[in-house]
Amino acid sequence: MKRIALFLLTNVAVVVVLGIVASLLGVNRYLTANGLNLGALLGFAFIMGFGGAIISLLMSKPIAKMSMGVQIINAPRNADEAWIVETVRRFSEKAGIQMPEVGIYEGEPNAFATGAFKNSALVAVSTGLLQGMTREEVEAVIGHEVAHVANGDMVTMALIQGVMNTFVVFLSRVIGYAVDSFLRRNDENSSGPGIGYMITTIVLDIVLGFLAAIIVAWFSRQREFRADAGAAQLMGRKQPMINALHRLGGMRPGAMPQSLQAMGITGNIGKLFSSHPPIEERVAALQNSQSA
């Protein structure tokens, strides 16, 4: 709950800073002269930016269960399920968090963690992961996901996404008004936003959205390095995580929804937009780390 409160306070602080900077630069007077209220725009940017991020965060568990077909292990039906639950329990105690829900789903090798609160999260592994790895390697992957939960990565990434969303919404509309005002500077009968505003806003929403995605992906990759190190600490040595990464490098990872990729063990391709670093970089980081 503390992280959610911090999330909201940080978001409000960002909006306040945007308002102060806009006022100091004279943007407030310019927007008012052209029929746009700065406070209303900031409120709109806050709702669109942070509202979407917080809703996505709060809905992450039910969406994950539904979209991935996750079966929650309430009562283990076999030795594998009992081992998974016990492994998550052991790592959770060691990481100082409450026991997450544990699930399993049909699919290619992958795993993920999700949830708005680190003491009521979900850790799920695929059947492909269980079939394609040794138990020690699966244990390392589970440690990686528990580390994501313990580090509060779900809230952190939602916060970063919310900040980026707000900047995109705010900047695209301020620039849109500036372009529209310039294009209609000699039209004394014009009122309200025109076609210049609408086109500029749409284009900038797309362009700035891509730039924001690159920034969010960069932060996600840094969290992956930290989760790898966390798995090594939970296991007491780093070689199992290194072995698991090598194994994943030779597998075809299972697809996951975009909202879950950042908390999985492998992510989408494309260096700039990838939520995960290349396998070789993760292995090198572990080998050079001071983890066990």
Curated annotation (Swiss-Prot):
EC class: hydrolase
Bilayer-spanning residue ranges: 4-24, 38-58, 152-172, 199-219
Entry's localization field: Cell inner membrane
Cofactor section: Zn(2+)
Domain of life of the source: Bacteria
Binding positions for Zn(2+) per the UniProt entry: H144, H148, E224
Similarity annotation: Belongs to the peptidase M48B family.
Entry protein name: Protease HtpX homolog
Gene source species: Acidovorax sp. (strain JS42)
